[in-house]
Regions:
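Class I SAM-binding transferase module
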Residues: 1-74, 78-352
Length: 352
């Protein structure tokens, strides 16, 4: 059986409704997968010029890497990365996605005359049967808010360990997370302080909920009080699922005298397998992406002077009940000769 016949056989074997596939699946998993059934989320991602162009350029500018190779697209969505790979000369591309949007992806692939070179399979990566025993390249857009929220990185790692040939390539292959502290008094008062007086009533119990929910929003560069601090780099060739729960130190040096109301996080992505490496950032210094930045408001307001340092530890782990949610703890200490400004604390957050 040749590659095309294998692909047709794999597609035929996978013709089961989305509802049937999700029977017995955990409710949180069903909610996650069905959220990608709607066109709006795909429109937002495709319109993210930084995201989509970075993937396109990393593939098109490295046609010599993709030529005559078998490529696996993990979480293929509407198939844009699969089509980039096919256009770059891949021998065959296999796209896998659990969402029912894959039916539209098949139509899109057909509209673009690529059905003979792209096989799209609906199902979980751990359960589908690929038409090839091994692949030369894995491509995936797996990143979530705060890099790992609702992330499918563990699925990419499964695909790497199960299907990638020795010496195979992963696009992208590196992710680095950064922290910085910001002045954001006005917004914090609106989001947190609001609960102190709601039409004359004390709603302060709601502040606890508000403080534990990170905010995903665009932060202006001028709000940064400290220099960025890289806290962790994930190398997709070597990282393991266990590494996705981590506890890392950070040091934030003030670049001006100001107040600190929150800590923000963002990530940079690198396509290091390229002849000329391609990178993009989701930070406040870079062009807008749909990932924005993640804001963690602190209970205390810190008053820092230029060159003073806030040190601490960030701990991240998947939630025990829903592995796609994150439990995050940030502990910090601000030591200064001025005892009135000394501050130390710990805040716990839940991304859900």
């Amino acid at each position: 059986m040749n590659g095309s016949e294998q692909a047709q056989s794999a597609e035929a074997a996978g013709m089961t409704s989305s509802a049937d596939r999700m029977v017995g699946m955990d409710h949180a998993e069903v909610r996650y997968f069905t959220s990608y059934d709607h066109h709006g989320i795909h429109e937002e991602m495709l319109k993210d010029d930084v995201r989509t162009r970075s993937y396109r350029d990393s593939i098109y500018q490295n046609r010599h890497i993709f030529k005559d190779k078998v490529v696996l697209d993990v979480g293929c969505g509407t198939g844009i990365l699969s089509m980039f790979a096919a256009k770059a000369g891949a021998k065959h591309v296999i796209g896998v996605d659990m969402s029912s949007i894959i039916e539209k992806a098949k139509q899109i692939v057909a509209c673009n005359g690529l059905s003979d070179r792209i096989t799209l399979l609906q199902g979980k990566m751990e359960e589908v049967v690929l038409p090839y025993p091994k692949v030369d390249i894995i491509i995936s857009e797996w990143m979530g808010y705060f890099l790992l929220y609702e992330s499918m990185l563990d699925t990419v790692l499964y695909a790497r360990d199960r299907y990638l040939v020795p010496g195979g390539k992963i696009f992208p292959d590196k992710a680095t997370m950064y922290l910085a502290a910001i002045e954001d008094g006005e917004y914090k008062d609106d989001k947190i302080g609001f609960w102190d007086n709601v039409y004359g009533f004390d709603y302060s119990p709601m502040k606890e909920i508000a403080l534990t929910e990170p905010l995903v929003d665009t932060v202006e560069l001028k709000a940064l009080v400290t220099d960025p601090c890289p806290i962790i780099t994930l190398d997709l060739y070597t990282v393991t699922p266990a590494d996705l729960a981590f506890k890392v130190p950070f040091t934030l040096a003030a670049k001006r005298s100001d107040f600190i109301h929150a800590v923000i996080a963002w990530f940079d992505i690198e396509f290091g397998a390229c002849h000329k490496p391609i990178t993009f950032s989701t930070g406040p210094h870079a062009k807008y992406t749909h990932w924005k930045q993640t804001v963690f408001y602190l209970r205390d307001v810190l008053t820092v002077e230029e060159e003073e340092v806030v040190s601490g530890v960030l701990e991240n782990k998947p939630n025990d009940k829903n592995k796609r949610d994150l439990d995050i703890n940030i502990s910090y200490k601000f030591e200064t000769t001025d005892n009135l400004r000394y501050s130390e604390g710990s805040c716990s957050y839940r991304m859900c």
